């Protein structure tokens, strides 16, 4: 693959497979000739005309050729167009602009790249040959908790189109008409109209709207339920849906029978999917959807592999419910299901750590396994706008994993979502990326930029106050920057849905920074009265943080608001406890050094339970419930 950069640096999302940039730009012509506009993908032509708004289409001017492989308008470029689904060829020079897709979606993606190239009425001279490495790329709305709003979903679909994602799987666990007991019933008129609008917007943005059904908890393996399921699919078909999925995840009982599941899915495939020429391949999520849950002595996965029609896609989350995808892991599952796995990546989903925001970078997935998977979709948070940071990165990874740049893509995502306060959002996101202790044992790096200074300072201070001044100043600057970022974010009006989602955490973030500043002033300890003033302020800040934690985000699972929990908060708490201890020793005092710790610990030999976080509410100690079926030994308990 050829990638040349000259004086002009061209950055594209996702990174193309082949890009040649000449050291020259041209002005977008005031007058142009559109060649092929009547034949080409109408969604692509619409985007082009919007970009050329105010320009004149005539028989003179620069030639702009647009179309799909085989069209007369781009026929002479047939050899340049990549022979891949959704591939495209794009060329810009002083004589002609060429936007040629291998298929209609490829042409649309050529326009999305063209839109990124166009800046201030100028275009770089480029030649691009591009195509996706992974066939299905997108999002599965499959989390527990508050489903996304209709407006949020509309915004998401437009975001996917811009970032060359082609799949949105609609499967919110709390939609009553998606799962038991109402999966057999049609949607009410209002909800049906909204779904119809979502399908239309998905089509305009070249996204496959995949409607998923979750019947396993109460399905009866009889003809009546088969007919009811097909009737429901037919209802969705009439609303415009052309892609379907069946989920058997997180269930127990008779619905987990792999033989019966395969029979039902093949029936759907043969009696519905294959009968209608405009329906895409059927997708299923198995009951044993990760390696740790697969019965080593059972035949669930191999039964699906042997019995399911070859065209049916099988979803997979990895070695665990929450895990990154490795070569060994995907080889293991592909051998059993006899087809490339369709990856359901459970990040940044936070339905098991709902008191945290997961705004950090996307990393950990093998970048050399594109050919081993048929799809890669991310399961997001219930916070739709905040999830776009990770979604943007997944779009880049799934399109061209070998050129995926973790940190640059993360920074670009933040700049895309909130350009007017990108530095402030980056500061906030840097310290809001870890999940904290959780039942799945999945963690993320956080506050990496200051972690070394924090560790050095804390170690030295605990050992006798001989800390390095540079480390101390680094921490001071960090807390100052956190406060500034919080204030700027709270007043930002550029992306109101985003700010509304993160506001409780931003308030907590600011209080955390203020507490950090005051604790460092206690460390400097000018005199006894000054120390006591700062001590009292810290205790007041602790109370304010407790109030936010008790009053905001009060979901029934992991209520509250946690921020900067991996490095920043432990640093502040341990420094506070240490400096109070030193003060008490020096002045024979008895100041309380308690921080907001959890005095209780969960002890269990059940893997899914032992790491579940605890909560204290008044005189009660609560265990955060698991979303999935809890298993131990040969028994299953819900």
Give names to the regions the model predicted.
Residues 2, 8-94, 120-128:
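Acidic, contiguous N-terminal accessory segments
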Residues 12-15, 20-21, 28, 119, ...:
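Substrate-binding groove of N-acetylhexosamine-processing glycoside hydrolases
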Residues 34, 103, 139, 160, ...:
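Conserved, mostly hydrophobic/aromatic
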Residues 34-40, 65-70, 100-102, 142-144, ...:
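Structural motif
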Residues 78-228, 232, 238-242, 273-274:
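Feature activates predominantly on carbohydrate-active enzymes
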Residues 145, 156, 174-176, 213-217, ...:
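Active-site-proximal loop/turn and secondary-structure-junction residues that shape catalytic pockets
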Residues 232-258, 280-289:
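Active-site groove signature of glycoside hydrolases
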Residues 568-571, 589-638:
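Disordered, acidic Ser/Thr/Pro-rich linker "stalks" and the adjacent N-terminal cap
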């Amino acid at each position: 693959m050829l990638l040349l950069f000259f004086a002009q640096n061209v950055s594209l999302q996702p990174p193309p497979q082949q890009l040649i940039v000449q050291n020259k730009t041209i002005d977008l012509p005031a007058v142009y000739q559109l060649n092929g506009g009547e034949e080409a993908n109408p969604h692509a032509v619409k985007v082009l005309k919007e970009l050329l708004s105010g320009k004149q289409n005539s028989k003179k001017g620069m030639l702009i050729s647009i179309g799909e492989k085989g069209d007369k308008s781009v026929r002479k470029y047939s050899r340049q167009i990549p022979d891949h689904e959704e591939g495209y060829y794009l060329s810009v020079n002083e004589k002609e602009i060429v936007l040629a897709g291998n298929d209609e979606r490829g042409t649309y993606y050529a326009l999305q790249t063209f839109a990124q190239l166009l800046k201030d009425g100028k275009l770089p001279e480029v030649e691009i040959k591009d195509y996706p490495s992974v066939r299905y790329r997108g999002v599965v709305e499959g989390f527990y908790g508050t489903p996304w709003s209709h407006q949020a979903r509309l915004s998401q679909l437009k975001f996917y189109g811009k970032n060359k994602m082609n799949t949105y799987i609609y499967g919110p666990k709390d939609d009553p008409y998606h799962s038991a007991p109402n999966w057999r019933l049609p949607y009410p008129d209002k909800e049906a109209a909204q779904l119809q609008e979502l399908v239309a917007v998905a089509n305009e943005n070249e996204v496959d709207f995949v409607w998923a059904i979750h019947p396993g908890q109460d399905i009866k393996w009889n003809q009546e339920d088969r007919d009811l399921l097909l009737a429901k699919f037919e209802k969705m078909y009439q609303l415009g849906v052309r892609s379907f999925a069946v989920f058997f995840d997180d269930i127990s009982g008779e619905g987990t029978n792999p033989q019966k599941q395969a029979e039902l899915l093949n029936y759907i495939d043969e009696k519905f999917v294959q009968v209608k020429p405009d329906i895409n391949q059927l997708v299923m999520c198995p009951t044993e959807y990760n390696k740790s849950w697969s019965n080593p002595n059972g035949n669930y996965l191999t039964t699906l592999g042997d019995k399911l029609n070859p065209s049916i896609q099988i979803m997979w989350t990895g070695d665990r419910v929450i895990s990154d995808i490795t070569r060994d892991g995907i080889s293991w599952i592909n051998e059993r299901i006899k087809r490339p796995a369709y990856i359901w990546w459970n990040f940044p989903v936070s339905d098991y750590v709902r008191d945290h925001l997961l705004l950090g970078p996307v990393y950990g997935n093998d970048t050399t396994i594109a050919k081993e998977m048929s799809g890669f979709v991310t399961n997001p948070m219930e916070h739709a706008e905040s999830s776009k940071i990770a979604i943007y990165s997944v779009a880049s990874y799934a399109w061209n994993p070998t050129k995926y740049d973790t940190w640059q893509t993360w920074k670009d995502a933040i700049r895309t979502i909130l350009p007017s306060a990108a530095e402030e959002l980056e500061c906030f996101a840097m310290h809001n990326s870890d999940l904290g202790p959780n039942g799945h044992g999945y963690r993320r790096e956080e506050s990496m930029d200051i972690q070394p200074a924090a560790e050095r300072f804390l170690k030295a201070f605990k050992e006798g106050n001989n800390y390095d001044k540079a480390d101390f100043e680094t921490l001071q600057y960090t807390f100052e920057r956190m406060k500034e970022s919080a204030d700027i974010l709270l007043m930002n009006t550029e992306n109101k849905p985003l700010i509304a989602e993160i506001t409780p955490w931003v308030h907590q973030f600011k209080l955390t920074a203020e507490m950090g500043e005051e604790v460092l002033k206690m460390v400097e300890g000018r005199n006894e009265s000054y120390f006591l003033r700062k001590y009292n302020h810290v205790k007041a800040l602790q109370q304010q943080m407790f109030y936010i934690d008790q009053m905001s985000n009060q979901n029934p699972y992991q209520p509250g608001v946690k921020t900067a929990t991996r490095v920043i908060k432990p640093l502040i708490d341990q420094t506070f406890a240490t400096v109070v201890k030193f003060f008490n020793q020096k002045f024979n005092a008895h100041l309380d050094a308690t921080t907001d710790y959890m005095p209780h610990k969960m002890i269990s030999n059940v893997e899914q339970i032992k790491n579940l976080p605890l909560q204290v509410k008044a005189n009660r100690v609560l265990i955060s419930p698991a979303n999935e079926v809890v298993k131990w030994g040969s028994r299953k308990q819900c």
